[in-house]
């Protein structure tokens, strides 16, 4: 007889091989047809008591998505779904940053020389087309990753109503008195020909000169000091700025010496000056810094006067203690000179070349002007050193960290230009400054990780006023009018509202297309002929920083609460979007636009190196999806400590694939063995079932808590350990005998099936937010007792607690099992046995039912017969004897419980009788 036909073997249509790369797109297509998945999530939670709004930080609509984009969006969507399955109403409106330099540069490359013949309107139209193209491309790429969001109604910062909303936000800040225009040194990208905000600057190593230059004091200064001659020795790393020198700064709290050679240094730095060979160190006089105040020295390049001033910014950690001061080329220089009413000189044009200011202000001798005007400043350094002659006391080169433009990757300069600023230190917010209010709001914000509050807090504490103007074409205009005669900017509610309404209807392009008379009301008190336009555009960080107002507060989008529950981006956004949003939100609402901030690290290769095409270590999301499947990409993120940098490689993805297979195969086994279960009624669970349900209760609860705290790696670690060690490693293995060999309705079998069904149901609930595709697929093959009324994954819920804790203390049994298998390993190694079914176990206690103990140790039976002892061990003073089973192997269940090898054991005989009946 073929006894295999009599066994209740597992059966399921849920495939062992996931075939993710081929099958995922089909399921994703269903999710996105008519926005099915997102709309269903909204509908299912329309009466929810709680809500969760994640406001999407907009990526640039430029280029294809990379693995960092995938990390960011998948993490966002997972958190959204975590709250959804908690029973909360959720909103996730994706967006794109459509303005700015990255897009404009790409368009410039496409247009080439043609750009010079185009109007601003035409250039902006090309930019708009470029952004639109990549919005569509990126949207499809995100959807190919199965990311669920309101893709049919995204926000785009270039939409007409959005540009109007950005402009209205700017006007609100102006009305608060926090906006001003002034000439001030700002980071300037000569390569991009535009001002930059702090967030648009990155630091790289750069080689520069370190020079010490003598500026001779004039006769009056020497007389006042009582010396025949003296020279201040200034230190600088930017020789090209010496032509614009207006002052020399000393620290007012330090003493300065005049050496025997007539050189002036800070007393605290004299020793280092001796070491450099600049002086013998013999002191002629020592004076307090303030005795030098307002004396004048002579610039050796042009003979112009340079005033000695006091500056708290002068440090004693290097240099000479006397700082070359060019107020047009440094923020500290600017503020120090401002106190003395010293003129700001700016002899450098927007492309980084010396201009006619050299001639107009006499900054170089006339015979040198032809050589220097039009010369790029970085090419002028060597020429400047040569011109200094004997006044150049010391010159060397060194490597230091220097600011670079984040887009052109060229070094930037400080350049004084007229720009628009949001003021950090004006007490305009109920007597408080924007800086003070922003810091207060940070203390009310939850950070993941908590260290984030210190990081952004120190940045807010030390940041300068925010330069929000740019001298480019593609952006939202700072659409203000000036009086033609007085050049005063006009802040007027009537004009603000009228321009905003035009932008809403025609877009911000109208600022360039329309004449002034068409941009003001017909009955306006202002005469169009007396007005002129401001043509600067807004920093894109202002665009993105005001998205909360346009998306959450405008009513234009079904995007959730007016204050976002969470902002989630890479850790670099402490100085970027998190901060710009904080400043805009606090400025207009005196409140941060978010309740919490979560940051993630960056993606690197297996060795922790940054990915680049030149290194050949780039792994694109599309490659992962087509090679391994999106589910593997998701699991890679969720198994990683995303707060730190995440390493990715084929090797790592293969390891993640192994973990996925463990999860999938466990689900498959559970489904296959509950396929014929008719109900969940059981008189009493067996001890082993109580044990696994108790273990599952603890693990599921801990994993759920970890997921709810966004600690996905911790949650999965607990879960995978349970699936491998407890569920698959012990329980499923020891349950096979009763599942396969007991009668269909046997109490022991049903107890196991019900336990497995309960575990399967909760496991699918728990994985729904993380591995939605796999859970959705599993539900199609699950017993109705597991899936209930769920038509798909979006009908599942984590609102019910899994509570089957029977208070089982398994310490004794786990210790006994461990020691038992230590002995089994020895017996197998010595080739005494091949299987534990060849054994019986002899015990002297009756704490547990013998039948269940036999299953626990996977032996044929618990026996007190006098049999051959193969091994012994002891646990808590209880003795265990491993004996050689004396009966024959049952041809059906393979346990050694039969009288002869042809006859089934008593249990199997009973089952067979039932089948024959």
Swiss-Prot record:
Main subcellular location of this protein, as a coarse class: cytoplasm
SUPFAM superfamilies assigned: Anticodon-binding domain of a subclass of class I aminoacyl-tRNA synthetases, Nucleotidylyl transferase, ValRS/IleRS/LeuRS editing domain
GO biological process, one term: isoleucyl-tRNA aminoacylation
EC number: 6.1.1.5
GO cellular component term of the entry, any: cytosol
Gene3D superfamilies, sorted: 1.10.730.20, HUPs (3.40.50.620), Ile-tRNA synthetase CP2 domain-like (1.10.10.830), Valyl/Leucyl/Isoleucyl-tRNA synthetase, editing domain (3.90.740.10)
Motif ('HIGH' region): 59-69
Entry-linked InterPro entries: aa-tRNA-synth_I_CS (IPR001412), aa-tRNA-synth_Ia (IPR002300), Anticodon_Ile_BEm (IPR033708), Ile-tRNA-ligase (IPR002301), Ile-tRNA-ligase_type1 (IPR023585), Ile-tRNA_ligase (IPR050081), M/V/L/I-tRNA-synth_anticd-bd (IPR013155), Rossmann-like_a/b/a_fold (IPR014729)
Pfam families referenced in this protein's UniProt entry, alphabetically: Anticodon_1, tRNA-synt_1
Motif mapping: 'KMSKS' region: 610-614
GO MF terms, alphabetically ordered: aminoacyl-tRNA deacylase activity; ATP binding; isoleucine-tRNA ligase activity; tRNA binding; zinc ion binding
EC category name: ligase
Keywords from the UniProt entry: Aminoacyl-tRNA synthetase, ATP-binding, Cytoplasm, Ligase, Metal-binding, Nucleotide-binding, Protein biosynthesis, Zinc
Record: residues binding L-isoleucyl-5'-AMP: 569
Cysteine disulfide partners in this protein: none
Cell compartments where the protein resides: Cytoplasm
Reactions catalysed, as given in the entry: tRNA(Ile) + L-isoleucine + ATP = L-isoleucyl-tRNA(Ile) + AMP + diphosphate
Residues engaged in binding Zn(2+): 890, 893, 905, 908
Signal sequence coordinates: none
NCBIfam families: ileS
Subunit structure: Monomer.
Domain notes: IleRS has two distinct active sites: one for aminoacylation and one for editing. The misactivated valine is translocated from the active site to the editing site, which sterically excludes the correctly activated isoleucine. The single editing site contains two valyl binding pockets, one specific for each substrate (Val-AMP or Val-tRNA(Ile)).
PANTHER family assigned: ISOLEUCINE--TRNA LIGASE, MITOCHONDRIAL, SOLEUCYL-TRNA SYNTHETASE
Protein name: Isoleucine--tRNA ligase
Annotated organism of origin: Campylobacter jejuni (strain RM1221)
């Amino acid at each position: 007889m073929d006894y295999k036909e009599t066994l209740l073997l597992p059966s399921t249509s849920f495939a062992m091989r996931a075939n993710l790369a081929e099958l995922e797109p089909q399921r994703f297509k269903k999710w996105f047809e008519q926005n099915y998945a997102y709309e269903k999530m909204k509908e299912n939670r329309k009466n929810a008591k709680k809500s969760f709004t994640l406001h999407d930080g907009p990526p640039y609509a430029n280029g294809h998505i990379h693995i960092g984009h995938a990390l960011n969006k998948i993490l966002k969507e997972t958190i959204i779904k975590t709250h959804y399955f908690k029973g909360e109403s959720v909103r996730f409106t994706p967006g794109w940053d459509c303005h700015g330099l990255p897009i404009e540069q790409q368009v410039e490359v496409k247009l080439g020389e043609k750009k010079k013949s185009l109007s601003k309107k035409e250039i902006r139209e090309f930019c708009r087309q470029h952004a639109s193209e990549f919005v569509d491309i990126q949207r499809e790429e995100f959807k190919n990753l199965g990311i669920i969001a309101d893709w049919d109604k995204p926000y785009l910062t270039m939409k007409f109503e959005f540009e109007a909303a950005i402009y209205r936000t700017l006007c609100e800040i102006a009305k608060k008195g926090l906006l001003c225009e002034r000439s001030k040194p700002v980071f300037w990208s000569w390569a991009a020909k535009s001002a930059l905000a702090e967030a648009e600057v990155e630091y790289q190593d750069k080689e520069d000169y370190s020079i010490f230059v003598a500026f001779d004091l004039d006769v009056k200064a020497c007389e006042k000091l009582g010396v025949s001659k003296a020279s201040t020795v200034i230190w600088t790393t930017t020789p090209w700025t010496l032509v614009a020198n207006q002052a020399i700064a000393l620290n007012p709290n330090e003493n300065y010496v005049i050496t025997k050679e007539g050189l002036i240094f800070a007393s605290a730095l004299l020793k280092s000056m001796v070491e450099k060979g600049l002086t013998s160190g013999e002191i002629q006089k020592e004076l307090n810094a303030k005795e030098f105040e307002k004396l004048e020295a002579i610039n050796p390049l042009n003979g112009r006067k340079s005033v000695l001033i006091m500056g708290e910014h002068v440090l004693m950690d290097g240099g000479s203690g006397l700082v070359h001061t060019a107020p047009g080329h440094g923020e500290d220089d600017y503020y120090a000179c401002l106190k003395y009413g010293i003129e700001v000189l700016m002899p450098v044009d927007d492309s980084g070349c010396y201009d006619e200011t050299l001639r107009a202000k006499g900054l170089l001798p006339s015979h040198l002007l032809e050589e220097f005007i039009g010369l790029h400043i970085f090419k002028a350094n060597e020429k400047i050193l040569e011109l200094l002659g004997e006044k150049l006391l010391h010159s060397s080169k060194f490597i230091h960290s220097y600011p670079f433009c984040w887009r052109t990757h060229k070094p930037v300069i400080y350049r004084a230009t007229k720009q628009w600023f949001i003021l950090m230190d004006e007490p305009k917010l109920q007597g408080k400054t924007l800086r003070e209010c922003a810091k207060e709001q940070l203390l009310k914000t939850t950070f993941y990780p908590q260290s984030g509050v210190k990081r952004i807090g120190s940045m807010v504490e030390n940041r300068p006023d925010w330069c929000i103007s740019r001298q480019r074409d593609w952006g939202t205009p700072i659409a203000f009018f000036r009086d033609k005669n007085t050049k005063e900017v006009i802040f007027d509610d009537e004009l603000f509202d009228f321009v905003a309404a035009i932008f809403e209807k025609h877009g911000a392009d109208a600022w360039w297309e329309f004449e002034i008379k068409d941009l003001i009301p017909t009955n306006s008190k202002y005469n169009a002929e007396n007005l002129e336009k401001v043509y600067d555009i807004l920093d894109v960080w202002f665009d993105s920083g005001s998205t909360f107002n346009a998306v959450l507060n405008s009513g234009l989008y079904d995007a959730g609460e007016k204050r976002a529950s969470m902002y989630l981006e890479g850790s670099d956004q402490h100085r970027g979007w998190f901060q710009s949003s904080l400043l805009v939100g606090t400025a207009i609402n005196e409140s941060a636009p978010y309740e919490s901030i979560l940051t993630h690290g960056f993606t690197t290769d297996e060795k922790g190196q940054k990915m680049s095409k030149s290194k050949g270590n780039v792994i694109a999301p599309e490659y992962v999806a087509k090679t391994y499947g999106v589910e593997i990409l998701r699991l890679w993120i969720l198994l990683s400590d995303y707060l730190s940098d995440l390493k990715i490689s084929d090797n790592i993805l293969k390891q993640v694939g192994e973990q996925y297979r463990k999860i999938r195969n466990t689900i498959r086994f559970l489904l296959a063995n509950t396929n014929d279960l008719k109900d969940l009624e059981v008189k009493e669970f067996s001890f082993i079932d109580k044990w696994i349900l108790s273990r599952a209760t603890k693990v599921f609860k801990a994993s759920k808590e970890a997921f709810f705290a966004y600690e996905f790696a911790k949650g999965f670690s607990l879960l995978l350990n349970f699936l491998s060690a407890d569920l698959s490693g012990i329980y499923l293995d020891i349950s096979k005998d009763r599942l396969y060999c007991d009668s269909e309705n046997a109490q022991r079998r049903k107890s196991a099936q019900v336990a497995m069904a309960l575990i399967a149901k909760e496991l699918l609930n728990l994985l729904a937010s993380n591995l939605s595709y796999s859970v959705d697929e599993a539900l199609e093959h699950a017993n109705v007792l597991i899936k209930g009324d769920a038509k798909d994954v979006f009908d599942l819920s984590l609102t019910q607690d899994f509570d089957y804790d029977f208070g089982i203390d398994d310490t004794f049994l786990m210790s006994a099992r461990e020691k038992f298998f230590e002995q089994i390993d020895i017996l197998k190694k010595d080739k005494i046995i091949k299987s534990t079914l060849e054994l019986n176990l002899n015990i002297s206690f009756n704490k547990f039912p013998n039948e269940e103990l036999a299953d626990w140790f996977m032996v044929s039976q618990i026996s007190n017969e006098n049999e051959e002892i193969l091994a012994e061990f002891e646990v808590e003073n209880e003795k265990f004897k491993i004996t050689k089973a004396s009966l024959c192997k049952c041809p059906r269940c393979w346990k050694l419980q039969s009288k002869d090898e042809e006859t089934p054991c008593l249990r199997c005989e009973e089952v067979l009788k039932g089948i024959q009946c």
